[in-house]
Amino acid sequence: MAQYSAEFKQAKVLVLGDVMLDRYWFGATNRISPEAPVPVVRVQENEERAGGAANVAMNIASLNVPVQLMGLIGQDETGSALSLLLEKQKIDCNFVALETHPTITKLRILSRHQQLLRLDFEEDFNNVDCKDLLAKLESAVKNYGALILSDYGKGTLKDVQKMIQIARKANVPVLIDPKGTDFERYRGATLLTPNMSEFEAVVGKCNTEEEIIEKGLKLISDIELTALLVTRSEKGMTLLRPNQEPYHLPTVAKEVFDVTGAGDTVISVLATALADGRSFEESCYLANVAAGIVVGKLGTSTVSTVELENAIHARPETGFGIMSEAELKDAVAQAKARGEKIVMTNGCFDILHPGHISYLENARKLGDRLIVAVNSDDSVKRLKGESRPINNLENRMAVLAGLASVDWLVPFTEDTPQRLIGEILPDLLVKGGDYKPEEIAGSKEVWANGGDVKVLNFENGCSTTNVIEKIKLLKD
């Protein structure tokens, strides 16, 4: 499949559906409340994530594809928070804000990696007049290559038939990840993507491949679909179309850690590929590869074009290890599109010692990815003297690449990495030692971009100079 590509130059996707904000409160639990037999959680940090149709849009944005998201939110703080979260990922939000309903919000309280409680803030949208939403759809859909209707049963898609008709009238394919057992309401859609359980709940138990094909083709005929893609967990996925041979794709997942959000990834990649003018076969192939990547991650995750391209061509992921500046810029862009926090530091790292290890581990804990910029041999010589470095650049970077705390390594030739930091613009710049933040090379560039700068302490008594002096004493 070497001709397949994860670069979607022509694609533009519109997503309409039940948008949600997922909130997580994390804290320690050390005692029981005197008021009731319940644990007391001392909240120490919180996190916000896009949920429902908003997560579908995040998946598309992670592929560097323009995406607009439509849905219903409340005129409230959570609606504003969700919009801000999405806009940071360059998702075009085109919501209808209601006075009468809250933004759908799910608040989870966790302690010691266990969920203690979930609080849902929502009201059914089935009684809402969706004429404004339909008008937005009719105005915008012609500008997109595909429409995803994301149904979580909250009522945003109560007029789903009208939505399908609007899109089909504009010759825009409609893809739906269905909810419930009433597939009749999706009549006329281009493609449905039920999982095996959802499929069997509608057509009945399937004991053989032949039954899946027979019942799937009947469903296509009954509700006038163009195609049906049944996702089958460890058995891969099967594409069915009238008068064409079934197209079966075996799973490509090496290890399955978490299937959360895999359905969102499948429909996102499918729609993106179709919007880019790819065939059903190629689109399903890419979606299957993406699903294999995302189930190997913990929690709701997205897939980047770097990961997808490498998986297509069976290359090891370039998202880790030693990189050129150009490769690093691409990897950072992909990571930021996934909402990851980028931390960057720099140094000579001539003879790696416990102080370095501790410092890098602490730096890595401050974000999702750690970049280490390493002085070239000439740069070290200018800074440290003619006798340095002890280890050349290739060896220094090879040792650093073996550390679990380090994601990306990049060399620089100047005396300071100021230019490089200005090109990469990490979310957080860290440096070890007695520096003041404003003295750190690249701090002005990071601050100007809205990032932060932090000084970390080195372990006392650990330094490359001390190691070298001890070696000299042994030699003497």
From Swiss-Prot:
UniProt xrefs under NCBIfam families: cyt_tran_rel, PRK11316.1, rfaE_dom_I, rfaE_dom_II
UniProt keyword Methyltransferase present: no
Residue numbers spanned by region Cytidylyltransferase: 344-476
EC numbers: 2.7.1.167, 2.7.7.70
Function: Catalyzes the ADP transfer from ATP to D-glycero-beta-D-manno-heptose 1-phosphate, yielding ADP-D-glycero-beta-D-manno-heptose.
Highest taxon listed in the record's lineage: Bacteria
SUPFAM superfamilies: Nucleotidylyl transferase, Ribokinase-like
Pathway: Nucleotide-sugar biosynthesis; ADP-L-glycero-beta-D-manno-heptose biosynthesis; ADP-L-glycero-beta-D-manno-heptose from D-glycero-beta-D-manno-heptose 7-phosphate: step 1/4; Nucleotide-sugar biosynthesis; ADP-L-glycero-beta-D-manno-heptose biosynthesis; ADP-L-glycero-beta-D-manno-heptose from D-glycero-beta-D-manno-heptose 7-phosphate: step 3/4; Bacterial outer membrane biogenesis; LOS core biosynthesis
Region (Ribokinase): 1-318
Root EC class: transferase
GO molecular function, one term: heptose-1-phosphate adenylyltransferase activity
Gene Ontology CC terms, in alphabetical order: cytosol
Keyword set, alphabetical order: ATP-binding, Carbohydrate metabolism, Kinase, Multifunctional enzyme, Nucleotide-binding, Nucleotidyltransferase, Transferase
Annotated Pfam families: CTP_transf_like (PF01467), PfkB (PF00294)
Protein name: Bifunctional protein HldE
Provenance organism: Haemophilus influenzae (strain ATCC 51907 / DSM 11121 / KW20 / Rd)
Residues annotated as the enzyme's active site: 264
